[in-house]
From Swiss-Prot:
Organism: Pseudomonas sp. (strain KKS102)
Keyword Cell membrane appears in the UniProt entry: no
A GO molecular function held by the record: biphenyl 2,3-dioxygenase activity
Family: Belongs to the bacterial ring-hydroxylating dioxygenase alpha subunit family.
Cofactors demanded by this protein: [2Fe-2S] cluster; Fe cation
Name recorded for this polypeptide: Biphenyl dioxygenase subunit alpha
Top-rank taxon, per record: Bacteria
Binding residue positions for Fe cation: 234, 240
Gene from which this protein is expressed: bphA1
SUPFAM superfamilies per record: Bet v1-like, ISP domain
Subunit structure: Heterohexamer consisting of 3 BphA1 subunits and 3 BphA2 subunits. A ferredoxin (BphA3) and a ferredoxin reductase (BphA4) must be present to obtain activity.
Length: 458
């Protein structure tokens, strides 16, 4: 047998000498006063703690079941900065394991996606089956002992890549490294009805239309996650003027576009998840997706069937919904773009894979969703570029010393009389409040400062 079993290896705690105490981390976010310390977006030591305490303990979106329909189909992606392989197994289940050879650490798969019977390290040829078992080591007998027969003291079963927990929710595949973390549905909790607005409109569920895209943005991952979690405010003010203008017919100008002031947002009771939407005003959805998708999503037989199926939610009154499942799963129901944010240090994030998640039918609607997503929310999309430009400029400013010396304001809604909306489940607030943002950062601070699930669990 090897020195450690796989179970022992996965249980080894990684500890580092830190300059940030748990108490100091908690002080970075004050949800009661609505204050955020800007160092959370730019500090390298905080980022290293994020990799350990957030990305190694949270349920992270990796893809859709439609990405890997057949045995041996795989997709390579990331959990934090750890490269992983997601593979469909012979029994139909899904495994996720570290994309790392246990010999010298080389990736065992260098393609983005495909179908394989095995994964072979290109450095020394160690080979692993689709379940992650080490099955072949070149010159094994010669390299590990001089016996021609018998036990060499090297057991291949000890040297498979680290395995993650895998669970799915209505087509979405999530993984988690932490054996002590709550199960996925407990983790999602009261956010599930808001996810269902996109994922559960029909009995057939959703599929993936078109390919996947990936791109890198030089900004901290939390700017992107927070915007999808809580920030309808930017869409109704300045950020998307160019995107909206490009969508208008020639006879209209921006003076004729009025964004709604009526809407709500949701803050999860636990977990940092959040969502927001306008009520009974389709202007934003029309500006992004055009009349065909807006009508399909809000009127007619498909919308009526969805409303009956999702009777917990008044879906036909919800427009322009945005959502983040903490930390990095973000999507836009009605626009139907969905993506993960993969951190690349404190100053960079990779968006992807990003894809369009669509109802199973009809075909013309799927094609219209695909076409409009290409135009608006992808690497070259008008709205995507509007968002990215703002995040990048914020990050550039945070290179300075004084830019990180004063707290940022997250006080919208703090001094406003309670505007919870009883028509929607869970804790809700006014659409232009920052209740969901305060919830996200409060949970961020808890995960960063509470290493034990006994205190952190729901």
């Amino acid at each position: 047998m090897g020195i450690y079993s796989e179970r022992e290896v996965q249980a080894v705690p990684m500890t580092f000498k830190r300059r940030w105490t748990d108490e100091a981390i908690r002080a970075l976010v004050d949800q009661d006063k609505g204050l955020i310390d800007p160092r959370i977006y730019a500090d390298q030591d905080l980022y290293e703690i994020e990799l350990e305490r957030i990305f190694a303990r949270s349920w992270l979106l990796l893809g859709h079941e439609a990405h890997i329909p057949k045995t041996g189909d795989y997709l390579t992606t990331y959990m934090g900065e750890d490269p992983v392989i997601m593979v469909r197994q012979k029994d139909g289940s899904i495994k996720v394991f570290l994309n790392q050879c246990r010999h010298r650490g080389m990736r065992i798969c260098r393609s983005d996606a495909g179908n394989a019977k095995a994964f072979t390290c290109t450095y020394h040829g160690w080979a692993y089956d689709i379940a992650g078992n080490l099955v072949n080591v070149p010159y094994e007998k010669e390299a590990f002992c001089d016996k021609k027969e018998g036990d060499c003291g090297f057991d291949k079963a000890d040297w498979g890549p680290l395995q993650a927990r895998v669970e799915t929710y209505k087509g979405l595949i999530f993984a988690n490294w932490d054996a002590e973390a709550p199960d996925l549905k407990t983790y999602l909790s009261d956010a599930m009805p808001y996810m269902d607005v996109m994922l559960d409109r029909t009995e057939a569920g959703t599929t993936v239309v078109g390919g996947m895209q990936k791109w890198v943005i030089p900004c901290n991952w939390k700017f992107a996650a927070e915007q999808f979690c809580s920030d309808m405010y930017h869409a109704g003010t300045m950020a998307h003027l160019s995107g909206v203008l490009s969508s208008l017919p020639p006879e209209m100008d921006l003076t004729q576009v009025q964004m709604s002031k009526n809407g709500s947002q949701f803050r999860a009771a636990w977990g940092g998840h959040g969502s927001g939407w306008f009520i009974n005003d389709a202007a934003i959805l029309m500006a992004v997706m055009g009349p065909k998708i807006t009508q399909y999503w809000t009127q007619g037989p498909a919308a009526e069937k969805a409303a009956k199926r999702l009777n917990q939610m008044p879906t036909q009154t919800m427009f322009g919904q945005h959502m983040t499942v903490f930390p990095t799963c973000s999507f836009l129901p009605g626009i139907n773009t969905i993506r993960s944010w993969h951190p690349r240090g404190p100053n960079e994030v990779e968006c992807g894979p990003s894809w369009s998640s669509m109802p199973m039918r009809p075909e013309d609607i799927k094609e219209e969703f695909r076409r409009q997503n290409i135009r608006t929310f992808n690497a070259g999309g008008t709205f995507e570029q509007d968002d990215g430009e703002n995040w990048v400029e914020i990050q550039r400013g945070l290179r300075g010393h004084k830019a990180k010396s004063a707290p940022l304001c997250a006080q919208m809604g703090l001094n406003v009389p309670n505007k919870s909306n009883p028509d929607f489940p869970g804790k809700t607030a006014y659409v232009y409040a920052e209740e969901a943002a305060r919830g996200m950062y409060h949970h961020w601070a808890r995960m960063m400062s509470e290493p034990n699930w006994e205190t952190l669990k729901p």
